[in-house]
């Protein structure tokens, strides 16, 4: 099997980003973005998705976190799309329910080639440690638009905003892991009746 790795650089007047991803990794992660809470959440993707991530970003944090968070989502989506390749032999679909104390989230993903985000997370607070939680929708929208996946994110229960967000990211990592797994019965076959994704 060919290596499912990618390295993408994205430079704008607002952010300079490098993302390296290995879909067949062990969950190793290295981040230098200037946004610690986002890094904590992306670590959940790596560990629960068993993908290796190395992400660096120099962004206009003197304004706010918006451009940095959104552009990391965009660049991660580009790297993911490149690493997953032609999708032959993968499971394509993935889903996970993840609890953390009182919080419970469900994430379902389809590596469909059609970008779509449906996200319903009724945060109980507007920020966690100074981080604007609305920016997570920007992160996932950026990822979806550039990875060309359909993603459903639902926080089903939760009172602690940190727990709500953490269950979303853990479930996303686990759903991603399921979707990119190779299916021996589908070896060399594209998982679509159209023959292409």
UniProtKB/Swiss-Prot annotation:
InterPro entries: IGPD_sf, ImidazoleglycerolP_deHydtase, ImidazoleglycerP_deHydtase_CS, Ribosomal_Su5_D2-typ_SF. Pathway: Amino-acid biosynthesis; L-histidine biosynthesis; L-histidine from 5-phospho-alpha-D-ribose 1-diphosphate: step 6/9. It comes from the Bacteria. Keywords: Amino-acid biosynthesis, Cytoplasm, Histidine biosynthesis, Lyase. It catalyses: D-erythro-1-(imidazol-4-yl)glycerol 3-phosphate = 3-(imidazol-4-yl)-2-oxopropyl phosphate + H2O. Pfam families: IGPD. The keyword rRNA-binding does not apply. Its EC number is 4.2.1.19. One of its GO terms (molecular function) is imidazoleglycerol-phosphate dehydratase activity. It is found in: Cytoplasm. The keyword Protein biosynthesis does not apply. One of its GO terms (biological process) is L-histidine biosynthetic process. GO terms for cellular component: cytoplasm. Belongs to the imidazoleglycerol-phosphate dehydratase family. This is Imidazoleglycerol-phosphate dehydratase. It comes from Marinobacter nauticus (strain ATCC 700491 / DSM 11845 / VT8) (Marinobacter aquaeolei).
């Amino acid at each position: 099997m060919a290596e499912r790795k990618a390295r993408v650089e994205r430079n704008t007047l607002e952010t300079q980003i490098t993302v390296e991803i290995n879909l067949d990794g062990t969950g190793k992660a290295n981040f230098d973005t200037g946004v610690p809470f986002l890094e904590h959440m992306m670590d959940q993707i790596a560990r629960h998705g068993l993908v290796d991530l190395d992400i660096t970003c120099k962004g206009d944090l003197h304004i706010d976190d918006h451009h940095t968070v959104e552009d990391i989502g965009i660049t991660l989506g580009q790297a993911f799309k490149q690493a997953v390749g032609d999708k032959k032999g993968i499971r394509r679909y993935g889903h996970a329910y993840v609890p953390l104390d009182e919080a419970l989230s469900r994430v379902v993903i389809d590596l469909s080639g059609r970008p779509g985000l449906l996200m319903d997370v009724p945060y109980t607070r507007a920020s966690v440690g100074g981080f604007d939680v609305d920016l997570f929708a920007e992160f996932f929208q950026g990822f979806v638009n550039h990875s060309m996946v359909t993603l459903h994110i639902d926080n089903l229960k939760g009172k602690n905003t940190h727990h709500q967000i953490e269950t979303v990211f853990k479930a996303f990592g686990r759903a991603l892991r399921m979707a990119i797994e190779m299916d021996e019965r589908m070896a060399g076959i594209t998982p679509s009746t159209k023959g292409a994704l």
